[in-house]
Amino acid sequence: MKAYERLLSYVKVFTPSSEETGTSPSTQYQFDLARLLVQELKELGVKGADVDEHCYVYGHIPATRGYESRQKLGFIAHMDTVSDFCDHPVTPVITPNYDGKDLALGTSGRVLSPKMFPHLSTLKGRTLITSDGTTILGADDKAGIAEIMTMIESLNDNTIPHGPLCIAFTPDEEIGMGPAHFDIKKFGADFAYTLDGDTEGEIQYENFNAAKAVVEFAGVNVHPGSSKNTMVNAALVAMEFNSMLPSADTPRDTEDYEGFFHLYSIKGDVSHATLEYIIRDHDAASFDVRKKSMEHITKILNEKWGKGTVSLTITEQYRNMKEIIDTCMELIEHATAACKECNISPLITPIRGGTDGAQLSFMGLPCPNLGTGGHAYHGPYEHITVEGMDIAVEVGLKIIELFYK
């Protein structure tokens, strides 16, 4: 079976994660896909395939003869999708021989256009897969799952000698909780790759340092007709706080290795207001400066409006895995060589986000990220090509071959 055929099946399984439930997994939907994958793994001959109580799927592929004592290599992808644009099941749409031009997404009124996504012109002649424009597609990261499954099927012909291989599919990656209950010992790998990137040939081992900031504002609410020198409008103080951050340090205005503050939630009135941010930077020193700048603004506003007006809570989320991967760069060398042998230019890019692999690397499992061939994740313009998925499978198999050469 081709990777894209598996993808078409997986995206029809509804698996959004949720930040609201506080459970693990965050949604029971994810078990629907997990059970399907366990069955497929068993049919492919994967040993010990099962799903645990937290919705982690594990399986193992025994080494070929003579390679039993070699290091164990793993491959990981996640089952959940974002909850945005995911209020009803996905309807995938296949466009053969895409012409590289504007493409209407069903009857949604949305148009996938090279004006918005310039890389589309390079996909001319390929078979494009999208949603109908009313939902995400779900290639993030069901394409990664489909590609790993296809790699497993290809390995069954025994033409690639390999050591013990470890497979895992995780829940709740999109809400940053993918590794929360990941059993490193049960998984068993010495090294692994996540298949959770964008274009085929992409190799990523640098991600953001990440934190979340919640800023609370306590106001003083009195009748506006008699409030001179008394009222403290929490909503206005919140606006003042945000105005003191660098105006160009936002996701819209940054790229590559540039960090940002992202204000993603505003709630409030005169009495109380809340701003919620994520703080991101690849450089650890710059990351610390960003956090300290928020602390400084909090201090300044409390001096101006009164002690306790502003309270700041910063929660660390994940760190840049580069410091771990730097100690085992052979993982990147194998991936780079694999791309070249598959006639694909390796594209080493920083991750402007995080992956399960970032956290797993600090848990003792070095885990860079590979591209799946997908684009425009987390929205209705998400798309992938059949050919890109085939290349991602080819690169993954070549990595296995080179790792055990």
Predicted regions and their residues:
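N-terminal capping segment at the start of a domain
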Residues: 2-28, 129-130, 318, 378-379
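A non-catalytic alpha/beta surface segment that caps or lines the substrate-entry region
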Residues: 22-70, 74-76, 80, 91
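Short, conserved micro-motifs enriched in small and acidic residues
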Residues: 28, 135-146, 228-236, 383-390
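Active-site metal-coordination/substrate-binding segment of hydrolases
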Residues: 67-161, 169
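Midchain, well-structured core segments that form catalytic/ion-binding scaffolds
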Residues: 112, 126-139, 171-295, 299, ...
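Phosphate-handling active-site elements
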Residues: 153-166, 247-254, 405
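Metal-dependent amide/peptide-bond hydrolase catalytic core
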Residues: 235-405
